[in-house]
Amino acid sequence: MSKPDIIQLLKMAIQRQFGMSINTIAELKIFQEELEYRTREVISFNTLRRFFDFLPSTKPSSKTIRILCKYLGFNNISNFLSQESMDINWLLWNKALGIELTKKLDERDLLWLKENSNQPDFYLHLATIIKSFIYRKKYGVIVTLFEQEDIVNFSMNVYSKFASMLCRLFRSLNKNELQNVIIYLIPIKSFRESVLHWYIDYTNLNGYYGDFLEAALPASNKESHEYLFYQLILNYRSFLLNIDNLEYLPTSRIKKDFFVVLKGRSYSYNLVYYNKNNDEAGKGETWNEILFQLDQNINIFLFMLEIMITLLLLKEFDKISYLIDEYYEDLLAPTNWTGYHVHSTVLLGHSVQLLYEGSFMQAKKTFQLINTTKIDGSYKEYNMIFYHLIEYQIALTTHAEDKNLKAIENKYLGYVQKTGFTFFSVDYLKKYLLK
């Protein structure tokens, strides 16, 4: 919370405690007398005039803040903010619960949602409200919510959390319920961009998520970033399902204003496309384009989000080694919850590099740095296929017993079955390091 917000919160709490708004000098004078009586301390009248905006405001001293908090019954500003946060959070949940129980949204509900959209955990309240209306089959209400640009408007990190909550909800719906949600929500661009783009559910590409993408493709503008996004993901799904006839989606379709992750995804898919068609020249040209992009002023972590795991998929060990040597720190840049699946991919890539170079003990140590309990979200099952794939290769270097190799193989196949990605065969597992 910013300092101006803290001061505003303190002003509101003081006036609640005082029992009336402080809008006039006379009211301020009465407040000063009560303040001195209750705290047995003094704040000058001019200081109070500045604090309540009767004079040009200045930053209040720590002594002024301490006395005002004392008036409210707190030892310091931290104690005040802690209690105020709990009160605000309760009021938000209480109001959100009331909205959940309504049959439709009125103007007052929408106004309240807009006014509170900047609260730290607002996305939780909004997702909970949407969940309630979905379970009650009030789809029109959800349409109204997504049509409000001031309500569904988050930072990148929060979009990921919001989309994660809704997509996990969609997993629980039966076919008829899911179809109704698709019919109502897919035509709304803000829904597509705030949910489908931020939670790519690899585990359910053959389920609800794939259904959403197939419906979203014809609903979007063919020249838009989202149309390319749907094409890339759906064709990538086809590759993982061993379906031939992948579409040619050239990187020339990338526009300057496209999000950096989408740009990286486009290059990633082209590596897959040219590999599938045994076009070494096309694959080489795409790799050179990737290297060119890495020399530009871009967010390398976001650009490489899909590329590293594609290189693992295609067994491009030399390229993985180059990236690890040149961009290791950049690839491990973010530390929040949304980035760990990429961290694990980079560590897998580093392990493969070391295996490829014959540094078996160091490969094992690097592999052991991966904390699988932190791999969560939409990439979890997909990442775990690669985790057990590399685990198997390391086990081979340590001359593991057949029963241990079989146990790893079964875990690998369990995730393959869960995703349906038949590209990952037993033969692929056992011959991975043989190019």
Q: What are the residue ranges of the model-derived segments?
A:
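Sequence/structural signature of beta-propeller modules
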Residues: S2, R66, L72-G73
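Recognition helix of helix-turn-helix/homeodomain-like DNA-binding domains
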Residues: G19-N23, E34-P60, I67-C69
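Short coil/loop linkers at secondary-structure junctions
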Residues: R38-V42, N75, T422
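Charged, helix-prone or intrinsically disordered regulatory segments positioned adjacent to compact structured domains
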Residues: K70-Q148
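Extended amphipathic alpha-helical coiled-coil/heptad-repeat regions
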Residues: Y123-K435
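A short, Lys/Arg-rich alpha-helix, primarily the initiator
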Residues: M1-E34
